[in-house]
Amino acid sequence: NWNQGLRYGGGTGNDLHGMNYLLAHMGVYYRSTELQDNGYTYDYLSPDLLSAEGVYFDEETQTIELAGYKALVIYQDWLDADGAAKILEWAKQGLKVVVLEGAAQLTLFNDGRDEELAQIMAELTALDTVRVAEIYDASEDFNYFDGVAEGYSDGVLEALQELGVTPYTQYIEPNHQLLGQTRMDDAGNYYLYLYNYC
């Protein structure tokens, strides 16, 4: 676990196993680094954000505003039914969505809405604006949130490209050294921030 930093027991010499996580080219929550390697920037967000005041889907730009998100990637095994319904509503209006296989199968807590979620997800994944991406390196009983060395290779990048979703700034070839974030100010100016891993 590269987040751990120091091995249990601490100490000096061979007992010290510190690692700067900023130098590790690894996914933390979403495991694949293929999106960032190809210039895509992303954030982790709660489905509750989609219903927050001032957040809307802009049909003209085909983005979630005010953040400018061009697509959503759903990779967690849980998703609340209200969030799924909002995603379905926007996907019908043109929002691009990629669902990683095995994602959005359960609702939070024990709210009794798993069947409702399943119906929403079945309708969502049938839309032309939605793709289901396969995990290429997962065993049969793979759980995305178990601490196993699987789930790092998937079809999300290909699905986004098939949907026509491109990064605001992209590299000529995959880059394992730079991590970028793009922001736009009120005047419509884009800013690209790059972090160099090396």
PLM regions and their residue ranges:
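Carbohydrate-binding surfaces of carbohydrate-active enzymes
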Residues: 1-198
